Structure formats: structure tokens, C-alpha cells
Amino acid sequence: EKYDDAESASDFAVDMVNQVVDGLKGVNFAVHLCRRAGARVRGELQHEGGYGPIINQLNRLRVHHLTMEFTAPGAGDMAVFKKIREDFEIGLGCVSCTPGQIDTPRQIVKRVQPALEYLDPSRVTLNPDCGFAPGSAADVSIDEVYAKLQHEVEAARQLRDQYG
């Protein structure tokens, strides 16, 4: 869908999130920037374009952690991290949710390394691009989910060995 005024709509969304978290102390908040991974698997509308056009809105969010999907085609360049607030932790979507596609630890490491050109490793957590959508048309078996997460853990070990 197109919005008549995307800038205004995204500003409104940020204001709403900030109102939700306003006044709550001692809690870390996260926002997931969904690229509709399950919809891609089902062959539905794909969202293309990087995070650059919404960087100003992201930087206004009063949250601690952003999860950003980067396995999707058209997710944009990781150079966007040059412009992201330095106090954000980044949950880097680096494991595909696509059924039948199990990324190797090496593939995952290769997806993460470009982000580390811009982000201190202490700010990065690894995560799947999105949830594994149990019960949806993009259903991933529990055994496959386990294998995907095992490979994510192994990639994290390799990255810790390399980057500290």
C-alpha cells in the first residue's frame, strides 16, 4: 500500500511507540523492523528498499534495541549503520526463515561481517530475519528451526573468536 504522506505516517508511528514506553524505567525495549519474511515465502508482496529513508524516525525511537532484517533481497546496504544512533543495540537478521533453506554457519558469518565494518561487535546480536511463523503458510518444522538456530550459535562462536 502507498501512503499519501509516508513521512507523516512514519512520524506518527514513532510518536505512538514513544508514548507506549514513556515513563517506564528499568526495562529494555526493542522494535522489530519487519520485512514480511513469511509473506515472501508465501509469494506475497515483497518490500524492497533499505532502511535509509526511515533513519531519522528510527533515531527518534526511545527504545534500546532494533531488530533489522538483512537476509531479504533488497534489504539495503549496511552502510546505514553509519547513521544509526550509537546507543542502539542491533539485532541483525542474518538467518533465513525460508522453509527448506538452512544457512551454513559460514553463510551467516559472511552476512554479519559487513555490519561489523560499521558497528562495534558489542552492539550486535544475531537473530533470524523474523519469526518462524508456526502454523502459517510459511511453516518451518521444529527440526529445521533447531538446525537453523544451531548454525546461528556456531556462527556466533566463530564471530566471537574473530572479533572478541
Which residue ranges define each predicted feature?
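Domain-level signal for soluble alpha/beta catalytic cores
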Residues: 1-164
